[in-house]
From Swiss-Prot:
It comes from Neurospora crassa (strain ATCC 24698 / 74-OR23-1A / CBS 708.71 / DSM 1257 / FGSC 987). The active site is at 238 (glycyl thioester intermediate). It holds the Pfam family Autophagy_act_C. Belongs to the ATG3 family. This is Autophagy-related protein 3. GO terms for molecular function: Atg8-family conjugating enzyme activity; Atg8-family ligase activity. It is found in: Cytoplasm.
Length: 346
């Protein structure tokens, strides 16, 4: 089934008519030319990302230049597994962030965040229950009954490691970003490795995917640019454009609000208009992206630059060449255990 799905997706991307008309602001979709521009921006600002070519000319997408068929970054750390009981450091909750039209659930995306604001963690009292079902007083544990960790001969004091380390400890991932022509947006592929460097069995990669996504939109498929078969976890791009459109719209709204405050003398012009965007993608830090950008050399167009106050209101907070930076923040909400910000360090 996965082979048929992978083959169908490859053929669909290769033979779907290519659009060269930009609809970035209206649909969240990008053209192949815009994908290349966004990839150039990503590799320039974050050198851990690089362009790569297909293994053979027959594997190339004809509408992308040779040598720029996909983007790749390697050795991305992943220190924790996500299972049904995943709660992060202090408990996490999954919240559906709806699209700007407030439509069906499929038009939104899940985000993980601290649950302390809505469901405080509480320590429950432990009491004894006798055979008749009567609840007794709280039982006090005698300190003498606690195993001594320094007692090598005490079998109770020994902490035994689990025999199977495939689902524990540090993993690393190689991440790939391709262009999905059928959906006119990027697509993420992920290939995992165990702490000893051995390839991670494909089904175990699902342990690093947020539950609702791995049940619905994440599949195991062959990477289309390799001559040999390599199974990877892939986030299906069917909803990427609508999610990106929502993120872009909210970034624009945040920028517009800040400009209005600045005109009223209530704000500073030093920060970039990303507040709404950051909030909607689980408050992930994007400061590194525009901190590097504002240091553009004199005479050059500043990356992530603030738009002058006298420009038209239709100016946007995020340019199309910055698209993949935002895309990676969205993907980070799908795989919160994978340290995507590691790939965005200089």
């Amino acid at each position: 089934m996965n082979f048929l799905r992978s083959t169908a997706a490859t053929l669909l991307d290769k033979y779907t008519p290519v659009s060269h008309t930009s609809t970035f602001r209206n649909t969240g979709q990008i053209t192949p030319e815009e994908f290349v521009a966004a990839g150039d921006y990503l590799t320039f600002k974050f050198p851990s990302w690089s362009w790569a070519d297909a293994d053979s000319p027959s594997k190339r997408l004809p509408f992308l230049p040779p040598g720029k068929q996909f983007l790749v970054t390697r050795h991305v750390p992943c220190h924790r597994r996500l299972n049904d009981d995943f709660a992060g450091d202090a408990g996490h909750e999954e919240a559906l962030v709806e699209g700007n039209k407030g439509g069906a659930d499929d038009d939104g995306w899940l985000r993980t965040g601290s649950m302390t604001s809505s469901q405080p963690l509480r320590v429950r009292e432990v009491r004894t229950v006798d055979d008749a079902g009567n609840v007794g007083d709280r039982e006090v544990v005698d300190e003498d009954d606690i195993p001594d960790m320094e007692d090598d001969d005490d079998d109770e004091a020994i902490i035994r490691a689990e025999g199977d380390n495939s689902n524990s400890g540090k993993r690393t991932y190689t991440l790939y970003i391709t262009y999905a022509n059928a959906y006119k947006c990027p697509r993420m592929y992920m290939s995992g490795y165990l702490s000893n460097g051995q390839p991670l069995p494909p089904h175990l990669m699902m342990e690093d995917i947020v539950g609702d996504y791995k049940d619905k939109t994440v599949t195991l498929e062959d990477f289309p640019f390799f001559s040999h078969s390599v199974k990877m976890a892939s986030v299906h791009p069917c909803r990427h454009a609508s999610v990106m459109k929502t993120l872009l719209d909210r970034a624009d709204a945040a920028l517009k609000l800040r400009r209005e405050k600045m005109k009223a003398g209530q704000g500073s012009g030093s920060e970039q208009g990303m507040e709404g965007l950051v909030d909607e993608i689980n408050k992930l830090d994007v400061s590194g992206a525009h901190a590097n950008a504002v240091e553009a050399a004199p005479g050059e167009d500043a990356e992530w630059e603030e738009v002058p106050h006298d420009v038209a209101d239709q100016e946007v907070a995020i340019r199309v060449d910055q698209y993949l930076v935002v895309f990676l923040k969205f993907i980070a909400s799908v795989t919160p255990g994978i340290e995507h910000d590691f790939t965005m360090g200089v």
